[in-house]
């Protein structure tokens, strides 16, 4: 079986390596000339770590920058509502782990580590799908005219998926109330006093602060979708944050405000493709289901897609020559196994964001929670912890039951 995978993000790269290690001939193409992209998802929940195990890609090499997240903190009007340490499930459980995505991809696809059956082409953009006389997808045509024949084409080319559009597969989008501005503090900034993920809710807006796997402090700021990007100076952004940050974080922001970089806007898109496959074509990751940034589900769901697809396709190939009908049945099983979990987690993400939006737009509720924070902190933390279980562990096994 010849497989062409378009898109060398976590889903495409992981699937390519897993299939090639097992003896499948795989060609992986990526439009970008390199794998280093800013502000990419790096938080691996237990669900994503499980997927890496299933793919045979665990543990992440020690040479890749990584660290266990310290915990989760939510502050309202400058007062800590709750703080919950990782791992949420208690000592000995898997914590949320931050992994540098560019470094991990570089390690995964390094020439010296690459499986013999894997061919990687960076800086080569896909331009169209090829079809045989029966209308079945039979390969990919690149922008330079190169044709890559395949028994199976896998689209892992992101939320704006060219392959999804070329296959005329509609994306059913869900309204989403935010876009996100991402900032990074330069390397000269001090270490944060708290090594967890902090969410700030107040009259200035909804923001988050954390230290990345590579040790750089990052800041996310939510804005309405379609709204103009605010033209604030670094000092003005810092002042807005300080106005609703707890004392320790406010002090850090004031001391390190000069190190804040310019924002990069991330337009949030959430949706489900009407179907994830056609004869000879499979869509995975954001190409099939762009996710909200809430609780870092994009990378985790993409890896779970790759894990289940790898298991299903390798089981099929191990039984001998694969017919077109058998392959299509396998593609249908992959979608049937993965779609319910993705749809449910998108709904859970929306609920999580709705709670934050409620606080954002109800000043009286923020003031009430801030005033009674010492009294309600433990109960709020327990409730929040319970709400996270499915977002952390997923809801479906990583097999098709075949």
Task: Annotate each language-model stretch with its function.
Residues 1, 50, 54-166, 174-184, ...:
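Conserved N-terminal helical subregion
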């Amino acid at each position: 079986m010849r497989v062409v995978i378009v898109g060398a993000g976590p889903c495409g790269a992981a699937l390519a390596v897993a299939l090639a290690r097992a003896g499948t001939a795989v060609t992986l193409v990526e439009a970008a000339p390199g794998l280093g992209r800013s502000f990419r998802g790096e938080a691996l929940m237990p669900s994503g770590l499980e997927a890496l195990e299933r793919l045979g890609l665990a543990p992440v090499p020690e040479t890749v920058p990584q660290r266990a997240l310290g915990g989760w903190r939510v502050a309202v009007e400058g007062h800590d509502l709750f703080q919950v340490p990782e791992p949420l499930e208690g000592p000995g459980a898997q914590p949320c782990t931050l992994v540098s995505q560019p470094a991990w991809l570089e390690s995964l696809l390094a020439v010296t580590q690459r499986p013999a059956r894997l061919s990687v082409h960076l800086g080569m953009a896909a331009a169209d799908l090829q079809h045989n006389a029966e209308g079945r997808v039979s390969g990919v045509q690149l922008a330079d005219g190169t044709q890559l024949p395949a028994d199976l084409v896998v689209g892992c080319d992101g939320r704006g998926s060219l392959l999804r559009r070329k296959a005329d597969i509609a994306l059913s989008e869900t309204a989403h109330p935010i876009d996100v501005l991402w900032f990074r503090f330069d390397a000269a900034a001090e270490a944060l006093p708290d090594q967890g993920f902090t969410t700030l809710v107040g009259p200035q807006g909804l923001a988050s602060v954390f230290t990345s796997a590579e040790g750089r402090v990052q800041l996310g700021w939510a804005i309405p979708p379609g709204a103009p990007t605010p033209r604030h100076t670094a000092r003005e952004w810092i002042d807005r944050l300080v106005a609703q940050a707890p004392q320790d974080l406010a002090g850090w922001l004031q001391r390190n405000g000069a190190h804040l970089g310019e924002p990069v806007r991330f337009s949030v898109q959430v949706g489900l493709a009407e179907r994830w496959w056609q004869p000879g074509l499979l869509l995975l990751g954001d190409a099939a289901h762009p996710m909200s940034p809430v609780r870092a589900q994009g990378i985790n769901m993409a890896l779970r897609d790759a894990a289940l697809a790898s298991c299903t396709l390798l089981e099929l190939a191990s039984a001998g020559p694969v017919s077109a009908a058998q392959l299509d049945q396998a593609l249908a099983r992959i979608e049937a196994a993965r779609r319910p979990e993705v749809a449910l987690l998108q709904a859970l993400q929306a609920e999580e964001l709705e709670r934050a939006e409620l606080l954002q737009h109800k000043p009286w509720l923020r003031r009430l929670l801030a005033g009674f924070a010492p009294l309600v902190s433990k109960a709020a933390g327990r409730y929040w912890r319970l709400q996270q279980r499915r977002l952390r562990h997923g809801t479906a096994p990583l097999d098709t039951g075949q």
